[in-house]
């Protein structure tokens, strides 16, 4: 089972979009060969809240589109596939204000941008990063492949 706990602090995200994000992340989970049960949360916030989270937890006083807090920073200490317990991946926090701005700037739907940001955060929870060119190429390539195969394209 894959459990995603959604919370919308903004009132801007339609509950039907929770289902699409759930389907997208479930699809990504399979593509990333995570076979055991897993849990994560996705929270939608405004600019003030994400800036405060960045300031308090990341020592960066700025607004970002998405933040991920992974509970497993490195390799898990145990192989969760050997046990019948869920793997708690962490938290994804998405700024709806920035998502809306980016969707308009890129010329695609708000719903598509939310899916993109949720997947981006999910891949961070799995250990992907974009701190250097090679890592960025790998992460963004994986991200694009999953979005395209799922059918959530920029068009």
Curated annotation (Swiss-Prot):
This is Endoribonuclease YbeY. GO terms for biological process: rRNA processing. PANTHER family: ENDORIBONUCLEASE YBEY, CHLOROPLASTIC (PTHR46986:SF1). It is found in: Cytoplasm. The lineage of its organism: Bacteria, Bacillati, Bacillota, Bacilli, Bacillales. It comes from Staphylococcus epidermidis (strain ATCC 12228 / FDA PCI 1200). The keyword Cytoplasm applies. Its EC number is 3.1.-.-. It holds the Pfam family YbeY. Belongs to the endoribonuclease YbeY family. Single strand-specific metallo-endoribonuclease involved in late-stage 70S ribosome quality control and in maturation of the 3' terminus of the 16S rRNA. It comes from the Bacteria. Zn(2+) binds at residues 120, 124, 130. Its cofactor is Zn(2+). One of its GO terms (molecular function) is RNA endonuclease activity. Binds 1 zinc ion. The keyword Cytoplasm applies.
């Amino acid at each position: 089972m894959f459990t995603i706990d959604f919370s919308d602090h903004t009132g801007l995200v339609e509950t039907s979009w929770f289902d699409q994000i759930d389907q997208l992340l479930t699809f990504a989970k399979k593509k990333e060969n995570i076979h055991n049960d897993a849990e994560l949360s996705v929270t939608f916030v405004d600019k003030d809240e994400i800036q405060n989270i960045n300031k308090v937890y990341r020592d960066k006083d700025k607004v970002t589109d998405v933040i991920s807090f992974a509970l497993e920073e490195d390799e898990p200490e145990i192989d969760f596939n050997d046990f019948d317990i869920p793997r708690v991946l962490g938290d994804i926090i998405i700024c709806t204000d920035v998502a809306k701005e980016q969707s308009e700037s890129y010329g695609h739907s708000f719903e598509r941008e939310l899916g993109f940001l949720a997947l981006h955060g999910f891949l961070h929870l799995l250990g992907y990063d974009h701190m250097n060119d090679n890592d960025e190429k790998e992460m963004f390539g994986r991200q694009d492949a999953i979005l395209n195969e799922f059918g959530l394209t920029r068009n």
